[in-house]
Amino acid sequence: MAAINDLISQIQDETLRNRIQEEVSKMAKQKKFGLVFEEHMPESTPLYDMPIKRGCNVMRRDSKDDKSIYVVLKVEDDTAACVKQEQKDEAVTFELKDIVRVAEFGESIYPYLMPVDSVCNAPDSDLWHTLIEADNYHALQLLEYLYAGKVDCIYIDPPYNTGAKDWKYNNDYVDGNDAYRHSKGLSFMQRRLKLAKKLLNPKDSVLIVTIDEREYLRLGCLLGELFPETHIQMISDLINRVVVAKDNEFGRSTEYIFIVYLGSASPAKLPLEEDWNHIENSTKDGIHWANLSRTTNSRRQDRPNMFYPIFVTRDGKRIAKIGDPIPLGQDRATVSVPSGCVAVWPIHTNGEEGRWMQGKDGLAKLVQKGYVRLGRFTDTGMAISYLNRAQIQKIESGEYIVSGYDESGTVIVDDSTYSATYIPDNLWNIKTHDAARNGTNLLSSLLKEKRFSFPKSLYSTHDTIRFFVANKPNALILDFFAGSGTTMHAVNLLNAEDGGHRRCIMVTNNEVSADEAKMLKDKGYQPGDAEWEKLGIAHYVTWPRTVCSIEGHDVNGKPLKGDYLGSEPPMHMADGFKANVAFFKLGFLDPTAVSLGMRFSEMLPTLWLKTGAKGKCPELTGEQMPDMLILPENQFAVLINENTFADFAEKLAEHPEIQTVFLATDYEVNYQSMVKNLNVANAY
């Protein structure tokens, strides 16, 4: 509707414009069912580092009053003559400093990654994380080329659309008076989630999305529409332990975590702290002997083959024999009992005939292994118990220690050292998930001032991700709403705890807050200016937090105080993490230069990411383009001049660790010919 209203406003005939507006308003008020929103809300991205030239699309830098997209007719000195896309008969002249080139959604783009900075605190490790400063839609387009179907876990904390001007849509802040803010939020998320779905491993991966009560209903419906083939679960996580009272409504203490399970994905059973143990869960207990006699839905006639005698010696210490099932109608008293034995039948306390939980042959195998235990004689027979499949698995896996066998042949299990592993319920009341203490205060200890509102608790993010990557030490984890950088901090903590090699990619824009934007504009600065950009979230929050947490100091260089919670042995924050991160800014290449093959150096970081970001990202020095690159430390190679293929193949043979190559050629037949002569796993 927003796009239609913009078009209606451009109708010159006032009578016609008013009639059309009236009819459209009637349509908008009609009752609709299901999740209905404006899916085609206009959205574009400013390209501050792209030159303005004839034929490109531009917007005014201060687009609050004029969000129109203009087409540049000509550039002369410091001005550009432009026309609106819809009205090409009225030319307008702008100063170049007042406009910015933009990319509309659906427009062909040529992204590249420009190195900004890096931190290397593990020079001997080939593991490198990545932070990308970008509009996340365009970053996801690039990542689709790099990692389609390869991501194990996506964790995102998108803007909650509170109406407090805490996020931007189409280069403008969205506030609570915006009639289309829900459509903008859903359209914004829909576009990005469609791309995110392509990145996830369809056989085994998860999408994790956190949200509050304002948008969880809409988000849940959207996820259901976009992922109809999956199972979706919602967790309630207590994140505010000090609730601020609100007038005429309940205080907010929780947020919600949607988990979208793809393929065979499931949470891992983990050893958990006492906070998780707030409801009864049998999987948390030690060794459990189950009653062999079923107590419910257990009449003899329901399973006749489960009604048979167990012959126990008169002293009650040993099973001498297991009898055969008797047919329905036969009186159990007619069964002969071996000398020196007592026949034990599955009889309920009310005297009714029941059935055993195991068939004759299955029980015999359990007895042979010592997995059946005899109790005392009772009025109706004897209490007999056994170990079920889950308990036996814990014995055979070594979780329970068998210390011997008693005189009846039953195993003696030592479960004193057993640490219960289990999947908790979906109501999390975990002290470490407190966003104030372990989010806001933790971030302030790194940055020494408040630079970001409502950061996540490090441990809430850590725990949520851990359920799905605990058994994936080489998992690829993506967060394309990186915010303050909690996700990478959590991944580094996970790797430090269990020696994992998990890799994290974070994407964030470099927006400033609404208040900061006003302050900067009052001083005469505009987006793209250095003074503006240095206060953006990527440079002012995400990257400093990443560097400080890895190197173990605050922004002033002073060692961090305290230990990470729940780690054994204690992990000191001042020790940092053995981790490396490369920081890039997503830029856009001129299509003409790309077609002429003039911008290879800018493409190198993309190729590095394509091959798994192993080792430090290589750089080309000098203007001379080499014929080839052989990069054993990065485990890939590039042939730039196909006329040197023979030399390339010879050098490549010296490095069997290189299993990925990129071959530059204009002809498919040449590419196929070269690939046939290379012994590598991947060629592009």
Question: What is the meaning of each model-derived region?
Answer:
Residues H138, Y160, E215, A482, ...:
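Short, glycine/acidic-enriched loop or turn micro-motifs at the edges of active sites
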Residues M1-P123, W128-H129, E144-A148, D152, ...:
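Accessory, often C-terminal, charged low-complexity segments
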Residues K448-Y459:
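Conserved SAM-binding loop and adjacent beta-strand
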Residues G149-K168, I477-V491, M603:
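Conserved proline-anchored active-site loop of SAM-dependent methyltransferases
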Residues D124-T162, D166:
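Conserved helicase NTPase motor core
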Residues R181-H182, S444-K450:
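Active-site-adjacent structural elements in folded domains
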Residues T162-N171, W428-L443:
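Active-site-adjacent bridging/hinge elements
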Residues A164-Y180, D515:
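Aromatic- and acidic-residue-enriched carbohydrate-binding clefts of CAZyme catalytic domains
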